[in-house]
Amino acid sequence: MVSEKIKAGVIGVGHLGQHHAKHYHLRNDVTLAGVYDTDSNRAKEIARQYNTKFFDTPQDLMEICDGISIVTPTESHYSIAKIAIEDFNCHVFIEKPITETTVQADDLIKSAKAKNKLIQVGHIERLNPALTVLEQYNLNPKFIEIQRLAPYTVRGTDVPVVLDLMIHDIDILLSLVKSDVKSIHASGVSIITDSVDIANARIRFKDGTVSSITSSRVAKDKVRKIKLFQENLYATIDLLLEQTEIYTITEDPSLIPDVLKTEPFTQNNESKHIAYQKPNLKKYDMLGLEIKNFIASIRGKEKPIVNGIEARNALDVVIKINNMI
């Protein structure tokens, strides 16, 4: 249990890493001990902005920290996290994906366990209020359709769309379905880049659940939607607009809270209703909540929202999909 302020550092202060630095800086239970970036001018700029130090090496920063955010290209995640955990006894928050390979992920998980350190992974969509509202429902989905489409941008195109975009939805899928994967079928094509730009995966689980996931980075408009079907319930989740709509089949709609409208129908000579809900969702800064969770986990008050094992399992499925295309 840590009682004084947590000393946190950020390795990689580019587009996303700068926001890690900001959130540590804003917390009154954290000292932003410093930042490091391969671009020293960028590190100096962010350090100046958040009244902290910049360091010439990651190791110099790790030496004074309790926890480290690793917000660097994926190929460096393993080496940086390994040093932070084993040589400097740091807890680590790694932006997704956890590592390049499952072998690397397994080794990090083993090291963290031996050193009694946390691995938290930044699968930020898990905190989307349109998704977390489903925790109020008894979910047992049988079919899940997920779409994540985005207009083309240069950022992120150095890796296939499966590793860049689809990994978000694989992590969500594995959190919704409490069963092991039975089979995967996948296809994809290159449109603009030399790697896969559009991909579709059909995943079947051992409990019979089926999912179809499509990811594209050459779409006209942004789309991030989930459709979830189970016995007597259908939900549509818009992660982009942060809206959720739920349709429930019930004999007594008065038992369902906050119903906006109902539609009666007859099934097998029984009177039933389709009850429609559109929960009023509270919006919040999801990265800020991830950082809050990381600090609370270091203190032993919470558990990481996405731990190393969960992130490793998502990576495993993503790699299998990518290898199949």
Q: What function would you assign to each model-found segment?
A:
Residues M1-Y50, L173:
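N-terminal Rossmann-like dinucleotide-binding module
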Residues H20, Y50-S111:
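Beta-loop-alpha module in the N-terminal Rossmann-like domain of NAD(P)-dependent dehydrogenases
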Residues D56, F93-I94, I119-V121, I237:
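Hydrophobic residues in well-ordered beta-strands that form the structural core
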Residues I170-Y247, N280-L281, M286-G300:
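Contiguous beta-strand/loop segments that form the cofactor/metal-binding neighborhood of enzyme cores
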Residues G122-P129, Y152-V181, V196-D197, A311:
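Mid-domain beta-loop-alpha active-site segment that forms a flexible
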Residues T99-G156:
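A contiguous active-site-proximal alpha/beta segment in oxidoreductase catalytic domains
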Residues M1-V2, G67-I70, L289-I325:
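C-terminal helix-rich "cap/oligomerization" subdomain common to oxidoreductases
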Residues A33, D66, K142:
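Conserved acidic residues
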